[in-house]
């Protein structure tokens, strides 16, 4: 039985255009890469899956982008209000030691769940994060605390590297020993990361961003392909070993 909690909102801050940073009281622990299913209120019947940014000391933090009616309603909530949360759900990242530096690489909303992962990984961690433009760059200070190195890329060149996060990944792999790569973001980015790491024999895990319905495996909204078969991301994922994800 999945755990449901009525949680008190502590913060719901607008940190960039359309992006909010929420913290709530939460009684459970979570693993990096897991997510929660949030009932946003109003007449929205389905919950919204949101990746966990941090979870420690009885506090759950998630950063989310307003993309529809549900998250729009969520963005209007204020401290002191209750929010109905199901979770934590899904399978998280493998945080075991690998010889060489760890690289966490994210694009867009795929950046947010990597903060807790970067905090928990052993050894040196390099973070590579991609955004559309400078005004959407978030969590840079947070990552600078838990990563020994951080790199930012923007699509339009208004901040950091002008280009793809995978450009930076290739440079890192060519200049030093990379032990493991952990990625979350859009499918084209994940596909490129899978190809690059496979070519160099580097351990890689990918977190799939799929639209979800129930979040507990009862529907088939979040299916993806793994070794030619349909699998439910909410049950088998959202984190997969790269070789297990057909992208």
Over which residues does each language-model region extend?
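Structural signal for conserved beta-strand scaffold positions within catalytic alpha/beta enzyme cores
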Residues: 11, 54, 152-154, 206, ...
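FNR/FR-type flavoprotein reductase catalytic core
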Residues: 72-209
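Short microdomains enriched in Cys/His and/or Lys/Arg
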Residues: 238-247
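Short, Lys/Arg- and Gly-enriched loop/turn segments at beta-strand edges
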Residues: 44-52, 90-97, 234
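Ferredoxin-reductase
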Residues: 2-79
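Local cysteine-cluster metal-coordination motifs and their immediate loop/turn environment
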Residues: 187-188, 209-238
């Amino acid at each position: 039985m999945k755990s449901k909690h009525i949680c008190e909102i502590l913060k719901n801050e607008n940190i960039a255009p359309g992006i909010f940073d929420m913290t709530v009281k939460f009684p459970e622990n979570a693993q990096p890469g897991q997510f929660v299913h949030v009932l946003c209120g109003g007449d929205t019947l389905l919950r919204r899956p949101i990746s966990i940014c941090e979870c420690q000391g009885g506090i759950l933090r998630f950063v989310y982008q307003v993309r529809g009616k549900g998250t729009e309603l969520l963005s209007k909530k204020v401290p002191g209000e209750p929010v109905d949360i199901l979770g934590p759900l899904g399978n998280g990242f493998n945080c075991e030691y690998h010889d060489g530096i760890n690289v966490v690489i994210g694009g867009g909303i795929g950046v947010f769940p990597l903060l807790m992962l970067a905090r928990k990984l052993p050894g040196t961690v390099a973070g590579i994060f991609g955004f559309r433009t400078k005004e959407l760059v978030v969590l840079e200070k947070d990552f600078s605390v838990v990563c020994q190195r951080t790199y930012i890329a923007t699509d339009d060149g208004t901040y950091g590297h002008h280009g793809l996060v995978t450009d930076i990944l290739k440079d890192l792999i060519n200049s030093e020993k990379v032990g493991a790569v952990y990625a979350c973001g859009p499918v084209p980015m994940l596909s490129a990361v899978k190809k690059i790491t496979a070519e160099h024999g580097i351990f890689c895990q990918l977190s799939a961003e799929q639209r979800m319905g129930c979040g507990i495996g009862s529907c088939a909204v979040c299916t993806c392909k793994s070794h030619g078969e349909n699998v439910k991301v909410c049950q088998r994922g959202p984190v997969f070993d790269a070789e297990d994800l057909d992208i």
